[in-house]
Swiss-Prot record:
InterPro entries in the cross-refs: Huwentoxin-1 (IPR011696), Huwentoxin_CS1 (IPR013140)
Record has Signal as a keyword: yes
Keywords, comma-separated and alphabetical: Disulfide bond, Ion channel impairing toxin, Knottin, Secreted, Signal, Toxin
Disulfide feature: 54-67, 61-72, 66-79
Residue span(s) of the pro-peptide: 25-52
Domain notes: The presence of a 'disulfide through disulfide knot' structurally defines this protein as a knottin.
Task performed by this protein: Ion channel inhibitor.
Listed name of the protein: U3-theraphotoxin-Hhn1a 3
Length: 87
């Protein structure tokens, strides 16, 4: 009984997929989902990480100095929060 339900679900899902593929015969209509996804996942310039002269938390501190509030870990060479046991 469960196997029959699964096969019916897969058949129905296949028919829905076939309908979606055949529904947009023109290339302009096929581009709509791509445009929608690209607009949803577009990265705005305001949200991009900016280059700094210092390294932030968990960044390599080999070439760059750590930003204020962080110290360079002597073991891992990452910028970490200062703590009494890390001095």
């Amino acid at each position: 009984m469960v196997n029959m339900k699964a096969s019916m679900f897969l058949t129905f899902a296949g028919l829905v997929l076939l309908f979606v593929v055949c529904y947009a015969p023109e290339s302009e209509e096929k581009e709509f989902p791509k445009e929608m996804l690209s607009s949803i996942f577009a990265v705005d310039n305001d949200f991009k990480q900016e280059e700094r002269d210092c390294a932030g938390y968990m960044r390599e501190c080999k070439e760059k100095l750590c930003c204020s509030g962080y110290v360079c870990s002597s073991r891992w060479k990452w910028c970490v929060l200062p703590a009494p046991w890390r001095r």
